[in-house]
Design a protein with these regions (language model features):
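Short, contiguous, pocket-lining structural segments
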Residues: 48, 73, 93-97
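An acidic, phosphate/nucleotide-engaging active-site surface
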Residues: 14-69
Length: 119
């Protein structure tokens, strides 16, 4: 029996970098209100960036059986094992498109069939 190897992907927590990003001229505006982050910076308690499939693929390539991540894109959770198992290159756009569709269906499929209804 083999041991379970757990991979960990970090890097999504960017709270400590917010001031650096603002000082570098990145306004980081609210996508709904267009309000710049600087106007509410003192109240921000959490800031996370989405991680794509590449670091998850790298963890799998290093022998992980299970990968624990911070905030990743919804489709990355499907895309990473597909890329790893089938050896898809980062620029194999047709294969990646199929993986994105599969990931999106798995992530949102239940909602499309009524799984997100209150009644």
């Amino acid at each position: 029996r083999g041991k379970i190897r757990i991979g960990v992907v970090t890097g999504d927590d960017i709270l400590d970098r917010l001031d650096e990003l603002l000082a570098a001229g990145h306004e980081l505006r609210n996508m709904d209100t267009n309000e710049p982050l600087a106007t509410i910076r003192d109240r921000v308690l959490s800031a996370n960036a989405y991680i794509g499939s590449t670091p998850i693929v790298q963890a799998l390539q290093q022998g992980a059986n299970v990968v624990v991540t911070g905030r990743s894109t919804d489709t990355a959770l499907t895309m990473a094992p597909l890329r790893h198992e089938f050896g898809w290159a980062e620029d194999d756009w047709n294969a990646l498109a199929a993986g994105i569709v599969a990931g999106h269906i798995l992530e949102c499929g239940a909602q499309c069939s009524g799984g997100n209804c209150l009644h």
